[in-house]
Amino acid sequence: MAKPARLATQGLAVALVVGLLALLVWRVANDNGKGVAQKLDDGEHPTAPAFDLSRLDGRGRIDLASLRGRKPIVLDFWASWCVPCIHESKRLEAARKEYGDRVTFIGVDTKDFSSDAREWQDKHGITYPSVHDGSGSVLSEWGGLPIPRIFFVARSGKVVGELIVEEDLPRYLRQIAAS
């Protein structure tokens, strides 16, 4: 009787090891290197990863790469389920009123339902355009969760910073508006 139990235990152990190896291989194969946030932490100023996503308001798409060389960009990663996103998006909406002629503001609704996101924008008075990144793949390129994540992109397309503390917003806005 002990032999079948031992075989079952060994089989379970082998299955567990094979599963962990498969997970490790998948992780290595799908690791696209350091995200933008990590590169900034390392002192680098990477070129903003390109994306081409549908606007939440249905007015076409936004292709980030095509905006390079025009105006600097503030990129706001948010979701309707994110409570802190309300505060940051309202701060960005106020900043857009001051800097909107010199800086482009773009929201990226991530890991969310587009219908919830549109309702959220209307409810909170957010008027800058947002795109939909339902799978979170664009967010992953920029560093992943947590959100809100707000990045500042110079006119050249280089990412110059990420909002970490409240004081970063006016500082980075002045910096990119002058670029």
Protein language model features and the residues they cover:
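Nucleotide phosphate-binding site architecture
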Residues: 54, 65, 83, 93, ...
